[in-house]
């Protein structure tokens, strides 16, 4: 069901992008916007993983340095029925993890030094299972496409606004065109953000459920989420300096905490609800 919802939401997001192109340049603008979207998605497909890893200065962990971690990831990947992803370490005290890569054969799981310091092996196993679930469900590609189109919508809306301000006062545009571009400038990025949130939240719940099945212990992930949520609040000032807002949706827990506005527009569902669902899943499995 969440797959159908994701396809529909991506369709709406693409339609919004084409509409922005049409408002800027009519039929020609819509065609240009379409090919621009295709080019950006091509770029996101091939290079988004490299950009994310470089942003966090992540380095691949050789097997010799952490054989226990490699063995854990290999076991979880076997349970999920996918190839073992490469493992990277991001040198930051913020405890978090994310997955990236264009498909299961070219995937990466990245953990921070902070998460290795605060989680027990079983809790870390739950987190890694969640990230492997994202790879199995191909959420990485979907989130990259959604983020790319969403960013492009904001850019097009801004272009439309400023082109009406400085592009002359021909009769075809006039005050009506200015009002239309102003509405697009304000509403299009908000609509794109809401759609991205809906996609991301839906797939986080799915990754929690799939991850719990992969590691066969929902409580491991639930307890990890409790610790990570607490740490996210404690380290919010550090995260504000180190975390790029454009990549926060990739993390297992949103590291950007603080304001009520940030919570309102969070790409993650409430951690408390995620934990509640995992405890309910554990009860059904007889783990509690």
From Swiss-Prot:
GO terms for molecular function: metalloendopeptidase activity; zinc ion binding. The keyword Translocase does not apply. Its cofactor is Zn(2+). The chain crosses the membrane at residues 1-21, 23-43, 140-160, 175-195. InterPro entries: HtpX_protease (IPR050083), Pept_M48_protease_HtpX (IPR022919), Peptidase_M48 (IPR001915). Keywords: Cell inner membrane, Cell membrane, Hydrolase, Membrane, Metal-binding, Metalloprotease, Protease, Transmembrane, Transmembrane helix, Zinc. Disulfide bonds: none annotated. GO terms for biological process: proteolysis. It is a multi-pass membrane protein. GO terms for cellular component: plasma membrane. It is found in: Cell inner membrane. The active site is at residue 131. It is an enzyme of class 3 (hydrolase). HAMAP family: Pept_M48_protease_HtpX. Belongs to the peptidase M48B family. This is Protease HtpX homolog.
